[in-house]
Amino acid sequence: MFFFRPYIGNSYYQGIQGKKILVIGASFYCPKTECIYFDKCTNTSIKNSSPYDDICPEYKANGICLHDEPTNSIENGYSTYKTFAKGLFDIVGDNNYESIWSHLAFTNYVQFFLPSNGENFRTTRANDLSERDFDAFIDVVKDLSPDIVIVWGCVINTSVKEDNKFVIDKEMLKANEDYLCHMRIPGVNHDIAIVNPNHPSSSSWHSDKERFLYYLSRALNE
């Protein structure tokens, strides 16, 4: 079961061009090194922030829990989320950040907070991932039944594409430049397109954005 409760926009089920789109990022980070729970909450061996869900001092002071971070991130409008929304302006036909995200759902793949020193946010590493994260990903997909899953970046893509037992057309990945494949999940009554652009926080996002939009348009028109 997933720990982070996905953000679900008010118009998610209306979708974009009639297609429901779930966005999957990599990780959330905690920079509060002074917190008494920091070492255990962000421990990359334990990989479990859930014991601190409703007792984290930082979140409790703001009336939220750790599991609310997907919605918290969208509402705070961090630069990565703005960059991604801007990339969808032409497809959505709207240049308003809140409006674009209202048509999407979002969560991150890794199901615990990674540590940060407050100045540098390290990239997600392969050894940060676990089977629990994949199971949580599938549970989110079953719950939200998206038509398209947009997967940010190259850290989690092997788990979601190449190693994903539910992907039905792995042989087409090379022909699709590793941007597009499809999965079929028991309990979901339609095939789901996976579109895998570069991460919006990377410099490659800007140089490859048009290629991403090409494959997203293909998925929208299937």
Annotate each PLM feature.
Residues 26-31, 110-114, 154-158, 199-203:
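Short, solvent-exposed loop/turn segments at secondary-structure junctions
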Residues 87-99:
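A short, Lys/Arg-enriched amphipathic alpha-helix followed by its capping loop at the start of a domain
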